[in-house]
């Protein structure tokens, strides 16, 4: 079944209809030689087993063979998850431990996703863009090239409340720590959003906005560019 992931209602339907998954990893010491491991990924040496699979299938094996099991440890990091995480192996970007990136996200060359950042389904992260610690890019949020999304900042998604237009952050924008960009807002090229601002309306190119709600306080000048310049070495 296909879904139009540019439509917030279609994204919601995709999440609703997706098969929910509770994958676990089980480390087991015991005799499981007569078990059926269909649909379970198994690695073993003698009586030592590592199992990867859905919780209900592995837990059935553990329960049926509890008299043969000496030790068991289970690791779990989600429950009834609807959307898998992005396969990051072939992405040419720096993604630090603890970042959470869901499937169907696009990440450009030499982007940086820092610890604790969350990037939701359908989002696009441009080339050379940094999503700093604990920042959030909501569903279908679009960040252009060489953007800096500051620590704890939020780019709202399209799901709740539903919005047909995603947030769009154009190239070379700097968004300060803990700023919030509300649903459907567009930030023009080269602009700066001050830390802690709440942006409720579109922002033109090459201006500085601040406050709650954010207002234009000046145009970007040489001093502003010097204070907000990015470091290429962080993106290598």
Swiss-Prot record:
Keywords: Acyltransferase, Amino-acid biosynthesis, Diaminopimelate biosynthesis, Lysine biosynthesis, Repeat, Transferase. Transmembrane segments: none annotated. Pathway: Amino-acid biosynthesis; L-lysine biosynthesis via DAP pathway; LL-2,6-diaminopimelate from (S)-tetrahydrodipicolinate (acetylase route): step 1/3. GO terms for molecular function: tetrahydrodipicolinate N-acetyltransferase activity. Disulfide bonds: none annotated. Catalyzes the transfer of an acetyl group from acetyl-CoA to tetrahydrodipicolinate. The lineage of its organism: Bacteria, Bacillati, Bacillota, Clostridia, Eubacteriales. Belongs to the transferase hexapeptide repeat family. DapH subfamily. It catalyses: (S)-2,3,4,5-tetrahydrodipicolinate + acetyl-CoA + H2O = L-2-acetamido-6-oxoheptanedioate + CoA. This is 2,3,4,5-tetrahydropyridine-2,6-dicarboxylate N-acetyltransferase. PANTHER family: 2,3,4,5-TETRAHYDROPYRIDINE-2,6-DICARBOXYLATE N-ACETYLTRANSFERASE (PTHR43300:SF10), ACETYLTRANSFERASE (PTHR43300). Pfam families: DapH_N, Hexapep_2. Its EC number is 2.3.1.89. The gene is dapH. HAMAP family: DapH. One of its GO terms (biological process) is diaminopimelate biosynthetic process.
